[in-house]
Swiss-Prot record:
One of its GO terms (molecular function) is RNA polymerase II CTD heptapeptide repeat kinase activity. InterPro entries: CDK, Kinase-like_dom_sf, Prot_kinase_dom, Protein_kinase_ATP_BS, Ser/Thr_kinase_AS. The gene is cdk9. Its main location: nucleus. It is found in: Nucleus. ATP binds at I25, G26, Q27, G28, T29, F30, G31, E32, V33, K48. Its EC number is 2.7.11.22, 2.7.11.23. It comes from Xenopus tropicalis. This is Cyclin-dependent kinase 9.
Length: 376
């Protein structure tokens, strides 16, 4: 697949006026996302506007990369790119500005994102439903990694869920193809990827020759969040994020992570010493299932070479013990409104460890979001 990566072309673009915009559902550095419907068929879609203002040399490389990748990836658990549209080109356009129209990526519409669902205290996931969410998420990662693509921005807001309960990995704006290092020459990918709270320790230490384990760390953060209802490590800076990781996963040392001292930043940063690994201990107040705790623990391994991959994760006992994964459709059918992070109140953050849940007998997956602040 990687061989075909640079040869993909996208065909003639229709005008975006064929769609009627209904509501804005997303905003970020990438641009805006709108819910829309096809004027003739009524089909609901999501329109992702490509920001062009700062592009002096033509079409943004990040958008081009996203389009090429999404044309190659076709899987039930990956968002589907329908087409690329543009605004009407001015009749006065010439050879120099004929491409200045706004470009939109058109996707199948998904009613929710996971961050929006977790922000709503009325949305209660059972253990079976959490298993289904994580099974679909890991299936999506298995597929993209098998096809030599890294997502590089795993977070709850980039996990979409349809009204029928089908999960879709979304926002491939930071994604890229990867390959094994050639002729002993390491890859030199940018490490300025992945939202800080979900960024793995190898990227924070400056690694540029990385691979699928960076996405699995994000999957571990998301899995824990299914119970805590908010991101588990909310650092303010890269140094702070590494400190939070050390406090949860244990001190970063060559004993637990061979050759970690090769990183220049490892010598420069003041990392916490003498920290014990406490992933299971800190999460057991929220996560009562022992298999779930064990899988989170294996996903949040400091050394990327020892971190569990998507194939082994899908074969973990968590997915093959009672209660088995169950469909989300019935639970979602009780919620008529779409839920997106952009439309939800700001996710709370604070500087202290929250109190233990008051009622331990209650299902931790169904605990009211208002009881928690930052977890770690």
């Amino acid at each position: 697949m990687a061989k075909n990566y640079d040869s993909v072309e996208f065909p003639y673009c229709d005008e975006v006026s064929k769609y009627e915009r209904l509501a804005k559902i997303g905003q970020g550095t990438f641009g805006e996302v709108f819910k829309a419907k096809h004027r003739q068929t009524g089909k609901k879609v999501a329109l992702k506007k490509v920001l062009m203002e700062n592009e002096k040399e033509g079409f943004p490389i990040t958008a081009l990369r996203e389009i090429k990748i999404l044309q190659l990836l076709k899987h039930e658990n990956v968002v589907n790119l329908i087409e690329i549209c543009r605004t009407k080109i001015s009749p006065t356009a010439n050879q120099y500005n004929r491409c200045k129209g706004t470009i939109f990526l058109v996707f199948d519409f998904c009613e929710h994102d996971l961050a929006g669902l977790l922000s709503n205290a009325h949305v209660k996931f059972t253990l079976s439903e959490i298993k289904k969410v994580m099974q679909m998420l890991l299936n999506g990662l298995y597929y993209i990694h098998r096809n030599k693509i890294l997502h590089r921005d795993m977070k709850a807001a980039n996990v979409l869920i349809t009204r029928d309960g089908v999960l879709k990995l979304a926002d491939f704006g930071l994604a890229r193809a990867f390959s094994l290092a050639k002729n002993s020459q390491p890859n030199k990918y940018t490490n300025r990827v992945v939202t800080l709270w979900y960024r793995p320790p190898e990227l924070l230490l400056g690694e540029r020759d990385y691979g699928p384990p960076i996405d699995l760390w994000g999957a571990g953060c998301i899995m824990a969040e299914m119970w805590t209802r908010s991101p588990i490590m909310q650092g303010n800076t890269e140094q702070h994020q590494l400190t939070l990781i050390s406090q949860l996963c244990g001190s970063i040392t060559p004993e637990v992570w061979p050759n970690v001292d090769k990183y220049e930043l490892y010598q420069k940063l003041e990392l916490p010493k003498g920290q014990k690994r406490k992933v299971k201990e800190r999460l057991k107040a929220y996560v009562k299932d022992l298999y779930a705790l064990d899988l989170i623990d294996k996903l949040l391994v400091l050394d990327p070479a020892q971190r569990i991959d998507s194939d082994d994760a899908l074969n973990h006992d968590f997915f093959w013990s009672d209660p088995m994964p169950s469909d989300l459709k019935n639970m979602l059918s009780t919620h008529n409104q779409s839920m997106f992070e952009y439309l939800a109140p700001p996710r709370r953050r604070g500087g202290h460890m929250p109190q233990q849940p008051a009622n331990q007998a209650r299902n931790p997956a169904a605990t009211n979001q208002s009881e928690f602040d930052r977890v770690f």
